[in-house]
Structure formats: structure tokens, C-alpha cells
């Protein structure tokens, strides 16, 4: 990438969204305006306990989707009922920051989420009390980087968007202005202001 390239969503946040959030919440200091810190994409592969090759598919999918090599997560404790031993690989995780984070969010919101069949919006009740938002996707095929013909099996993933918001209301306002398609109480998608 060239040095003067700025991701589209990052530029939109800096030029438009920050001013609207400052006006909406009457912040005295620009450092109080909520922003996105990082995005964590986690793919749990419980079957990897029985077949260690399963984790390779998850690593390949996450690498293609995020453009970054994932960290393999291992079991911390042995659980006999799940035939799980300590140190076995059970998932993969990627933490995105900076321009890669903005590019991933842009692709997620403009390309991936609209490709989900019968998509009616994301629930706005999945905030953690500190303005961070977590949601799950049931399979990885909505990302255009994944070739459906070469995919070995569908895998779900959890995506956590970590913000600097102090409460859920600020986090919800930030993500709605970034373009997250939240459902309202009637189950219809809300429009961004």
C-alpha cells in the first residue's frame, strides 16, 4: 500500500462521524469521542480435538478473510467428557488494528453482511456494558475471499468490535453511524442518521 492511502471508513469516521457524535453527546474534549480500537475475529473449532487437521482449514479461512495470520488457541484445561487434553488446538483468533481493522469493517458492512441469506439486521442487545459489541456469523461463505467450491466445511465465527465508548449508548451510536445494520424492536433494520 502507498503511504498516503487512508481506508474509506476511517476517512468517513474522521471527517463526518466524529463531529456528529460530539454534537449528539455534547463532549467537551475530542478525546471523549468514542472510536474503534480493535476488531477480534474468533473461530472455534471443537472438532480439532478429534482431528488436528481441522484447525488448518480454520487458519486458512481466517487468513483469507482478514489478511493476517491467526493465533492458534489451545485448551487450558483437560476435559475428559469432551476428550480434550491440555494444549490441544481448539480455535483460531485474529486481532485487527489500524488500517487493516478499518478495511475489514468496510468489507464486512458493505459486502459480507448484505450477502447473508434472509438477513434482517444485527441485534442491538449484544453490547457488554462498556460499548463493545460482539456478534456471531454462522458460516464463512458470505466473505467473497472464501471460495465456496474449495471450502471443506462451514465454520462459524465470533466478531468483537472493541470501542473506546464508556457505555452501550455511545457504542451503539458509533457503530450505527459507521453503518452497522441494527434491528429495531419490530425486527426491521434501522437506518443510520
Curated annotation (Swiss-Prot):
GO function term, MF aspect, one: structural constituent of ribosome
One GO term of the biological process aspect: translation
GO cellular component terms, A-Z: ribonucleoprotein complex; ribosome
Keyword flag DNA-binding: no
Annotated InterPro entries: Ribosomal_uL5 (IPR002132), Ribosomal_uL5_bac-type (IPR020930), Ribosomal_uL5_C (IPR031309), Ribosomal_uL5_dom_sf (IPR022803), Ribosomal_uL5_N (IPR031310)
Entry annotated with the keyword Ribosomal protein: yes
Matches recorded under PANTHER family: 60S RIBOSOMAL PROTEIN L11-RELATED
Family the UniProt entry places it in: Belongs to the universal ribosomal protein uL5 family.
HAMAP family, A to Z: Ribosomal_uL5_B
Oligomer status and interactors: Part of the 50S ribosomal subunit; part of the 5S rRNA/L5/L18/L25 subcomplex. Contacts the 5S rRNA and the P site tRNA. Forms a bridge to the 30S subunit in the 70S ribosome.
Function according to Swiss-Prot or TrEMBL: This is one of the proteins that bind and probably mediate the attachment of the 5S RNA into the large ribosomal subunit, where it forms part of the central protuberance. In the 70S ribosome it contacts protein S13 of the 30S subunit (bridge B1b), connecting the 2 subunits; this bridge is implicated in subunit movement. Contacts the P site tRNA; the 5S rRNA and some of its associated proteins might help stabilize positioning of ribosome-bound tRNAs.
Protein name: Large ribosomal subunit protein uL5
Provenance organism: Corynebacterium urealyticum (strain ATCC 43042 / DSM 7109)
Amino acid at each position: 500500500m502507498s503511504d498516503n492511502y487512508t481506508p474509506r471508513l476511517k476517512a468517513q469516521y474522521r471527517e463526518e462521524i466524529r463531529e456528529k457524535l460530539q454534537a449528539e453527546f455534547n463532549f467537551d474534549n475530542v478525546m471523549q469521542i468514542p472510536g474503534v480500537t480493535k476488531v477480534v475475529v474468533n473461530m472455534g473449532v471443537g472438532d480439532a480435538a478429534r482431528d488436528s487437521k481441522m484447525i488448518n482449514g480454520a487458519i486458512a479461512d481466517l487468513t483469507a478473510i482478514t489478511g493476517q495470520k491467526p493465533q492458534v488457541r489451545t485448551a487450558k484445561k483437560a476435559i475428559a467428557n469432551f476428550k480434550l487434553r491440555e494444549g490441544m488446538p481448539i480455535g483460531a483468533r485474529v486481532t485487527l488494528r489500524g488500517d487493516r481493522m478499518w478495511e475489514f469493517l468496510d468489507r464486512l458492512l458493505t459486502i459480507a453482511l448484505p450477502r447473508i441469506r434472509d438477513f434482517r439486521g444485527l441485534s442491538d442487545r449484544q453490547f457488554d456494558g462498556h460499548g463493545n459489541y460482539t456478534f456471531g456469523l454462522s458460516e464463512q461463505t458470505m466473505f467473497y475471499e472464501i471460495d465456496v467450491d474449495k471450502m471443506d466445511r462451514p465454520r462459524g465465527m465470533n466478531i468483537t468490535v472493541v470501542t473506546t465508548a464508556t457505555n452501550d449508548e455511545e457504542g451503539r451510536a458509533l457503530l450505527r453511524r459507521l453503518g452497522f445494520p441494527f434491528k429495531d424492536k419490530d425486527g426491521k433494520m434501522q437506518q443510520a442518521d
